[in-house]
Regions:
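Non-transmembrane, aqueous-exposed alpha-helical and coiled segments at domain scale
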Residues: 1-428
Length: 428
């Protein structure tokens, strides 16, 4: 094949079939991908583990399953163990007879066989289904400077920004191919130049901005560009502690889903901003000022996709991306306190908190698990988005504090404080 980038002798050998026809096809795909984006060469994937975005066994994805079979048969397995996005189903999550038929017979009817394929390709274990693979409890936490082959947008933006790893916003399958060959094309966010900020965002709010709305505003403004955010340290500090990481997790997911951000820098907080400061800002960077009025404008312009905009919510999802352990504890305390204040013992709207299986396991080993269960809240490991993809679920009035879930589904966004108020008061 004709290609523009420079390949090492070892890479050329793989491309020419030296490690089998299947590996040659995988390498050819990566070379074509890199050429399309102007990559000059391939660079090694240096992270200990990979992560895949496609976790759901949709019946219509037969070409994907055929491809997986070809990879397995050809010995083109992942060179690194990997985690994968959350599973789509959990019997504990509120559903209906008809919804379950759609889920199991028409939508995710290939889940078991696909799970088996993932295990053969290199899945870490059955607890490794989460969009927040970087959580300490999960153990797939890249080091600063690690080159990754990931695709899940919320994980990519977190790894790039909060951990200082290097990864492009790859597509599903491409990220698996990078893990198989152990190389990715050198372009975009993998390069020094590609990590320069072309936007300066000045946060000038009078109170701590809601992570989901701030991220949404920035994502919609800068799209796929890199923003350098000033003024946020006033509200979330200059230490990357558990609180700041949880805030940035949700903030980043909103920038990535409401826009296409793959990397952001937070002045005085994120690793590269601490080390390099404003030298990360490219010449001619645009400026976006965010004040209280701008955040209100953004939130007030979210469309309501419900047929009846005044309907009583039938379901609430909290945890997209998956909640951290500290967030689970905080939500449990807040729900219990709010119920007590309102003279109630149970939530008024079916509510599901989602977190990584390993985080759920840790939480369930504490007294807080019984407290949360007593309120009626369901704790699950699923992907709320995969649940909402059911056409019957999409017709329901569902509420969430996730801007990502709002963007991709018919669910309605409320702030965390608003969600807490809604689910702990008498349903109207």
């Amino acid at each position: 094949m004709n290609y523009k980038m420079h390949l090492t002798p070892e890479e050329e050998e793989i491309l020419n079939g030296g490690k089998g026809e299947t590996m040659a096809k995988v390498m050819k795909t990566l070379v074509m991908y890199g050429d399309a984006f102007g990559a000059t060469k391939m660079v090694p994937v240096t992270s200990k583990m990979g992560h895949l975005v496609t976790s759901f066994g949709l019946g219509v994805m037969q070409p994907v399953y055929d491809l997986m079979d070809q990879l397995i048969a050809g010995g083109a397995l992942s060179s690194q163990k990997f985690s994968v996005d959350p599973k789509p189903l959990d019997p504990n999550v509120p559903s209906s007879f008809l919804k379950n038929i759609v889920f199991k017979k028409f939508m995710y009817n290939m889940q078991d066989s696909y799970d088996a394929q993932l295990a053969k390709l290199g899945l870490i274990d059955s607890k490794s289904y989460t969009c927040t693979c970087y959580m300490d409890e999960v153990g797939n936490t890249p080091k600063k400077g690690d080159v990754l082959s990931w695709a899940e947008s919320s994980a990519v933006v977190y790894a790039n920004s909060v951990l200082g790893a290097r990864c492009n916003r790859n597509s599903g399958i491409i990220e698996l191919f990078g893990s198989i060959v152990g190389r990715v094309p050198y372009f975009g966010l993998v390069t020094d130049e590609g990590r320069k900020a072309t936007w300066i965002v000045e946060v000038k709010t009078t109170k701590k901005p809601e992570a989901q709305i701030l991220g949404s505003a920035i994502g919609m403004k800068v799209m796929e560009d890199v923003p350098y955010v000033k003024g946020l340290d006033k509200w979330i500090g200059t230490e990357l502690d558990g609180y700041a990481k949880a805030y940035l997790k949700d903030f980043g997911a909103a920038t990535a889903s409401n826009g296409a951000v793959g990397l952001y820098h937070i002045d005085k907080l994120t690793p590269e901003a601490v080390e390099q400061g404003e030298s990360l800002i490219a010449e001619g960077a645009k400026v976006y000022v965010i004040d209280d009025a701008e955040l209100d404008r953004v939130k007030n312009n979210y469309p309501v996709m419900w047929k009846d905009k005044n309907a009583t919510p039938k379901l609430c999802f909290v945890g997209c991306p998956h909640l951290s352990y500290d967030q689970l504890v905080e939500w449990t305390e807040n729900v219990c306190e709010s119920l007590k204040k309102n003279g109630r013992s149970k939530i008024s709207i079916p509510t599901v908190f989602t977190a990584a299986p390993a985080v759920v396991e840790k939480f369930n080993a504490t007294p807080n698990a019984a407290k949360l269960k007593a309120t009626g809240v369901v704790l699950s490991y699923i992907c709320p988005l995969m649940y909402m993809n059911n056409p019957l679920a999409g017709k329901m009035p569902v509420i969430t504090n996730s801007n990502k879930l709002r963007t991709y589904t018919t669910s309605r966004y409320y702030t965390s404080a608003e969600i807490l108020d809604i689910i702990t008061k008498e349903a109207k």
